[in-house]
Amino acid sequence: MDSTTLSQTPGSRVSQYIALTKPRVTQLAVFCAVIGMFLSTPGMVPWTPLIGGTVGIWLLAGAAFAINCLVEQKIDAKMRRTSWRPSARGEITTAQILLFSAVLGGLGMWTLYTFANPLTMWLTLATFVGYAVIYTLLLKPATPQNIVIGGASGAMPPALGWAAVTGHVPGDAWILVLIIFVWTPPHFWALALYRRKDYENAGLPMLPNTHGEKYTRLHILLYTVILFAVTMMPFISGMSGVVYLAAAVLLGALFLAYAWKIYREYSDDLARKTFRYSIVYLSLLFAALLIDHYARVLIGA
C-alpha cells in the first residue's frame, strides 16, 4: 500500500467499492428484474416486494460482481478495458473485497427473505453462485462457450423479479429468461471481436481468439436470427400484444441489420456500435413489454 492509497478520501474509497459492483451492468439486470415484477400482475405491484425485491436483487448482484472483480483482478490488469478497476490496480485488498461481497450478499439474502419470499432468496443465491463461481471460476477461463453456458445466470433477473411478487415462476417468466439467454452471446461476442487483443493478452479463450473472426461473425448473425424468433414468443403465447410485437420486430430488424453488416463487412467500429446497440435493444425491448402490458390492462384486453 503506497502513500496515494493511504491518503484517499472517503469519497474516493466509496467510489472504488461502487465500481466493484459494476453499476451499469447491475442497473440493466435490476431493470429487467423490475420489468418481471410488473409483468407478473395486472395491477400495481405491492410496494413491499417491489422495493424489497429490487434492493435485495441489486445487493446480491453487486456481491456477485465484486467476487468477479476479485477473481479476475490479474486478468483485468492486463486488459485496457478493465485495468482501471480498483481491484486490478490493487487499491482494495482481497480481504476487503471478500468482506464487502459478504456484507452485500448477506444483506441481500435477508432483504429478499424478509420483504419478498424464500423462493426469491434461493433463486437469487443460485444466480450468484452461477455467475460468481460457475461462470467466473470454471467456465470463463476454460471454454469459448463460456458466454453461452454461463449466460444462464445472467438471464435470470426477470424470473427473480416475477418470483419476488408472486412466489412462483410460471412459463411466461421463463420466456423472458430465454430472451436474455439468447441475447447474451451476440452481445458479448461483438465486444469480444473489437477487444480480441485484450482477451488474447489476458489468456481468455473467447470465441474470436479460439475460432477466428469469421466464425464469430457468423455466430453473431445466427444467434441474432434465433433471438428475433424467440422475441416473438411473448406475443405468440398471449403474454403480450401488438404494441410489443411492433417494437420487437423493429428493434430486432435493426439488430439483424447490424449482425448482417458484421458478417459481410467487419470493422471494429461496427462491432463497437453493435455492442452498444445490443444494450439499447434489450432495454427498449423490456420497456416495450411493460408498456404493452399496461396498455392491454387499460383497454381490458
Curated annotation (Swiss-Prot):
Gene3D superfamilies: UbiA prenyltransferase. Keywords: Cell inner membrane, Cell membrane, Heme biosynthesis, Membrane, Transferase, Transmembrane, Transmembrane helix. Its main location: membrane. It is found in: Cell inner membrane. InterPro entries: Protohaem_IX_farnesylTrfase, UbiA_prenyltransferase, UbiA_prenylTrfase_CS, UbiA_sf. Pathway: Porphyrin-containing compound metabolism; heme O biosynthesis; heme O from protoheme: step 1/1. The chain crosses the membrane at residues 25-45, 47-67, 97-117, 119-139, 147-167, 173-193, 235-255, 279-299. GO terms for molecular function: protoheme IX farnesyltransferase activity. It catalyses: heme b + (2E,6E)-farnesyl diphosphate + H2O = Fe(II)-heme o + diphosphate. Its EC number is 2.5.1.141. CDD domains: PT_UbiA_Cox10 (cd13957). Belongs to the UbiA prenyltransferase family. Protoheme IX farnesyltransferase subfamily. Converts heme B (protoheme IX) to heme O by substitution of the vinyl group on carbon 2 of heme B porphyrin ring with a hydroxyethyl farnesyl side group. Carbon 2 of the heme B porphyrin ring is defined according to the Fischer nomenclature. This is Protoheme IX farnesyltransferase. It comes from Paraburkholderia xenovorans (strain LB400).
